[in-house]
């Protein structure tokens, strides 16, 4: 069968192989889980550190940096934050939007205005540069207004977005050549806005300092079909050698496969955390043991009823895919969460913890869900390398019955 030429690929962020995902945080600490537990799931990972939280605690980081810089001896090595916050074996990603937060808004004009829930901060571009200099992230994202699909944007606003983008890049270029020479610069681009020509000029001008692109304005409630159109429009004009990032307020497996199919390298999904927060566990088959003739499926072959077009498919049939451990039917169920779970706790025990409102339940479920997602990404990497990723997509949909229509 003919192999479809697509953008999915294996690359690297630092020494982490992609496609991969990031660890989401609240107050610069992982949601429900600590770094020690995360290291049991993966040797190295990218940890999100939101700009608002860094800015609100900048005076603390500044004092810490001062202290460790003045007291540093030859025996002490590594970044000062590793001594202070135990960020060892992680890459700190200074990001703008926190996908764990529903009520998010960013406005970039003369000042940057960030709002998460009830917390708001207003600061200048120079304040942002100061955050970079003090926090010294391994990866950082340049702020841009979040413009969702179907949001109307006039010519004046488009020009303002590009002008501010150039202003940010001009200042970042200076510190990239001094303080942050080893840090990756990710440019946030509103891919829902028609700015093809001018954005190409900006990327070409600052090509030497731009390491990746964040496709902003996507990852909310739009369907895969709608998102596909946005992908096609923006990815056609972006250089292929740049890393591609996306933030998904859901980030379920179908959305993950869809994003990777279109060449996204780093995904920020909320799915594992949202489920754990609500007492739910991911239950999915991951390992495709047998290939059908070792060939790729042609996703464009509409005559084959057994082929699923990932561009048109949305996440359905979560009844078997998600285990709701709040359900009383698990009171006497002494089996583990799933057959491929890294945890030994029984469903009945976790149900009991949830009923008693014990935080331990969310810790266990977060660990389980992140482990399953890490295994999922490892399988994806494997099948891309073996040139059967499209087969894996089709197998995954069939095996997990994600193709069933809602009743």
From Swiss-Prot:
Disulfide bonds: none annotated. It comes from the Eukaryota. It holds the Pfam family TGT. GO terms for biological process: tRNA-guanine transglycosylation. Belongs to the queuine tRNA-ribosyltransferase family. This is Queuine tRNA-ribosyltransferase-like protein. It comes from Plasmodium falciparum (isolate 3D7).
């Amino acid at each position: 069968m003919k192999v479809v030429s697509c953008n999915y690929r294996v690359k690297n962020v630092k020494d982490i192989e992609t496609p991969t995902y990031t660890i989401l945080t609240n107050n610069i600490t992982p949601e429900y889980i600590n770094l020690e537990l995360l290291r049991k799931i993966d040797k190295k990972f990218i940890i999100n550190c939101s700009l608002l939280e860094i800015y609100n605690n900048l005076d603390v980081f500044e004092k810490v940096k001062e202290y460790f810089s003045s007291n540093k001896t030859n025996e002490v090595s590594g970044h000062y934050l590793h001594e202070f916050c135990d960020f060892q074996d992680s890459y700190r990603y200074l990001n703008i939007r926190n996908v764990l937060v529903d009520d998010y808004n960013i406005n970039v004009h003369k000042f940057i205005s960030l709002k998460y829930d009830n917390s708001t901060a207003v600061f200048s571009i120079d304040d942002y540069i100061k955050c970079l200099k003090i926090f010294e992230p391994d990866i950082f994202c340049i702020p841009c207004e979040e413009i969702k699909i179907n949001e109307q944007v006039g010519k004046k606003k488009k020009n303002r977005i590009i002008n501010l983008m150039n202003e940010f890049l001009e200042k970042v270029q200076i510190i990239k050549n001094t303080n942050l020479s080893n840090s990756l610069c990710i440019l946030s681009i509103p891919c829902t806005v028609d700015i093809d020509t001018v954005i190409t000029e900006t990327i070409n001008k600052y090509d030497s300092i731009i390491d990746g692109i964040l496709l902003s304005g996507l990852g909310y409630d739009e369907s895969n079909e709608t998102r596909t159109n946005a992908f096609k429009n923006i990815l056609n004009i972006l250089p292929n050698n740049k890393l591609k990032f996306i933030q998904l307020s859901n980030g379920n497996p179908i959305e993950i496969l869809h994003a990777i199919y279109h060449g996204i390298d780093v995904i920020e999904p909320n799915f594992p955390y949202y489920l754990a927060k609500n007492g739910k566990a991911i239950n999915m088959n991951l390992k495709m043991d047998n290939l059908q003739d070792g060939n790729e499926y042609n996703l464009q072959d509409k005559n084959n009823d057994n082929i699923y077009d990932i561009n048109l498919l949305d996440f359905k049939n979560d009844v078997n895919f998600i285990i709701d451990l709040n359900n009383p039917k698990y009171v006497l169920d002494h089996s583990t969460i799933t057959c491929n779970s890294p945890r030994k706790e029984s469903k009945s025990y976790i149900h009991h913890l949830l009923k008693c409102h014990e935080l331990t339940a969310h810790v266990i479920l977060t660990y389980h869900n992140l482990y399953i997602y890490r295994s999922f990404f490892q399988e994806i990497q494997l099948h891309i390398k073996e040139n059967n990723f499209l087969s894996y997509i089709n197998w995954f949909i069939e095996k997990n019955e994600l193709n069933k229509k809602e009743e």
